[in-house]
Amino acid sequence: MDDSKIVAGKVKKPGKRGRKPAKIDLKAKLERSRQSARECRARKKLRYQYLEELVSSKERAICALREELDMYKQWCLAMDQGKIPSEIKALLTGDEQKTPQSCSNKTTKNSKYSSSSGI
């Protein structure tokens, strides 16, 4: 034979390796590509919506913590002036006896802040 090789009873011609693409339906390929792009855009939109919701929830949490910090600062300023805020009086008096579970959380939270602040 000339340049052909015989492998497992088949005659192979030298040249390109691998699969030879069959006649590709260009319209079908283009439609698959468009569908894939639509799905990609939809996934991207959902991801951005999720991230925006996450950011807004974190911003709300930050605002709540800032308000709580301002409240504690006001309490400290009042105690520096010799006044005891009514909220602290309520914590120190009967409220702890009425609801020990909820106040114990508040008490540990307050003690955590007062021990860590150098005021």
Curated annotation (Swiss-Prot):
GO terms for cellular component: nucleus
Region of interest called Disordered, as start-end residue ranges on this chain: 1-23, 95-119
GO molecular function: DNA binding; DNA-binding transcription factor activity
Pfam families, alphabetized: bZIP_2
Gene Ontology BP terms: cell differentiation; positive regulation of D-glucose import; positive regulation of DNA-templated transcription; positive regulation of fat cell differentiation; positive regulation of lipid biosynthetic process; regulation of DNA-templated transcription
Gene: crebl2
Localisation: Nucleus
bZIP domain: residues covered: 23-86
Keyword DNA-binding tagged: yes
The protein's name in its UniProt record: cAMP-responsive element-binding protein-like 2
Function: Probable regulator of creb1 transcriptional activity which is involved in adipose cells differentiation. May also play a regulatory role in the cell cycle.
Alphabetical UniProt keywords: Activator, Differentiation, DNA-binding, Nucleus, Transcription, Transcription regulation
Region annotation (Leucine-zipper) ranges: 62-69
